């Protein structure tokens, strides 16, 4: 999938968890911030500052929000919300998980 947008892209990658998650920050013309990235097979815990909407582009994942005991699964075209000042666990198995993270 290819989208054409007016944006500034941080060409230096954000690399987390020994390379298991790699993303690039994007700032749209209106100031909206996003990141586009990939998570390799692993189970990882992320902390949030601002609220996030995670949009699945390819692959699949299971997530467990802070305070929850249950895992929810998401595939291509699906999204999940993560509250600000919180955390979530994400489990990726098999194929890499490609995402767009919408901040705020």
Curated annotation (Swiss-Prot):
Secretion signal, residue range per the UniProt entry: none
EC number: 2.4.2.1, 2.4.2.2
GO cellular component: cytosol
Reactions mediated catalytically: a purine D-ribonucleoside + phosphate = a purine nucleobase + alpha-D-ribose 1-phosphate; adenosine + phosphate = alpha-D-ribose 1-phosphate + adenine; cytidine + phosphate = cytosine + alpha-D-ribose 1-phosphate; guanosine + phosphate = alpha-D-ribose 1-phosphate + guanine
Annotated S-S bridges: none
GO molecular function, one term: uridine phosphorylase activity
Family listed: Belongs to the nucleoside phosphorylase PpnP family.
Function: Catalyzes the phosphorolysis of diverse nucleosides, yielding D-ribose 1-phosphate and the respective free bases. Can use uridine, adenosine, guanosine, cytidine, thymidine, inosine and xanthosine as substrates. Also catalyzes the reverse reactions.
Family matches, as HAMAP family: Nucleos_phosphorylase_PpnP
Protein's name according to its UniProt entry: Pyrimidine/purine nucleoside phosphorylase
Gene name of the encoded protein: ppnP
């Amino acid at each position: 999938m290819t989208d054409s947008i007016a944006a500034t892209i941080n060409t230096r990658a954000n690399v987390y968890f020994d390379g298991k998650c790699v993303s690039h920050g994007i700032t749209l013309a209106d100031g909206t911030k996003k990141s586009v990235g990939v998570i390799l097979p692993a189970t990882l815990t992320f902390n949030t500052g601002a609220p996030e909407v995670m949009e699945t582009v390819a692959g699949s994942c299971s997530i467990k929000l802070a305070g929850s005991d249950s895992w929810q699964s998401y595939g291509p075209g699906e999204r999940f919300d993560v509250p600000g000042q919180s955390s979530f666990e994400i489990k990726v198995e098999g194929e890499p998980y490609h995402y767009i993270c919408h901040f705020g």
